[in-house]
């Protein structure tokens, strides 16, 4: 009985995390989703702060499934856009999803590596402006 109860509690916690991520991605221009205490999520946040954006940072438990959380957020975006296919610019591209997951303007950018690549290529600031994350 104890195992069934803890499994139910874990399922409820996972559903709560999915709801929280989905809501944040729908409402905030920039969202970083990472595990609690993740140093790479901290680096992503600092990079975005350095560009003038103020990202919402959601920390999830160690047992959280990155693919499920990202998929929940992307499904909400697809429903909002009125389509079933991945929106153009969603950085998943069928690749494995890992934390931290960075969303800008409701679209999945990818992880820290993709965020850094955008910054180094000069693509990050225009995307942040388009998402309404910068007031410049």
UniProtKB/Swiss-Prot annotation:
Keywords: 2Fe-2S, Cytoplasm, Iron, Iron-sulfur, Metal-binding, Nucleus, Redox-active center. GO terms for cellular component: cytoplasm; nucleus. A motif (Responsive for interaction with TGA factors) lies at residues 133-136. PROSITE patterns: GLUTAREDOXIN_2. Residues 18-135 form the Glutaredoxin domain. It is found in: Cytoplasm; Nucleus. InterPro entries: GlrX-like_pln_2 (IPR011905), Thioredoxin-like_sf (IPR036249). The keyword Disulfide bond does not apply. It comes from the Eukaryota. [2Fe-2S] cluster binds at residue 38. One of its GO terms (molecular function) is 2 iron, 2 sulfur cluster binding. May only reduce GSH-thiol disulfides, but not protein disulfides. Belongs to the glutaredoxin family. CC-type subfamily. This is Monothiol glutaredoxin-S3. It comes from Oryza sativa subsp. japonica (Rice).
